Amino acid sequence: MITENLLVGNINDSKDPPVKIGALLLVAAEFSLEAPGWVISNRIPFSEYAEAEPLLLDHAVSWVEQHCSSNRVLVCCRAGMGRSVSVVMAYLCCVQGMAYADVFKLVMTRRPGATPLPKLEDAITQVCLLREARAKNKKDLDSGPPAGA
């Protein structure tokens, strides 16, 4: 358990999640999703040991954000130590506004031996920028054209 609503797990956890879980995200490219029907689930494939692609990471963060407010979310990969941890770290930085150093410390305390993906901090920075641009565009669209236009 990383936070009260965010957990990380391995491939076996994705097949038989605890009943306290309401949503499950599988982030392992080499596995198919075999989650039970009672849990909301999705698969966003990341390659093991590769750098996180910012667009994929953004998609995963948005999915976790969408489901985390009303569910405990379990993010799984093969071992539950790399890709799943990286997605949770990105969520905590980009959505919860935590500093990367604080998130890293939290994750290492809660999940000793975790190995975030290479250059994760850079990818998280890109995701935060994508999210900011999206929010600005939405705000601009919602406010309509300027007066006199």
Can you name each region flagged by the protein language model?
Residues 1-72, 93-126, 132:
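Cysteine-based protein phosphatase catalytic domain of the PTP/DSP
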Residues 15, 86-88, 148:
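Residues at secondary-structure transition points
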Residues 71-89:
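A phosphate-binding catalytic loop at a beta-strand-loop-alpha-helix junction
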Residues 131-138:
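A charged, well-structured terminal subsegment
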Residues 140-148:
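Positively charged N-terminal leader segments that act as targeting/secretion signals
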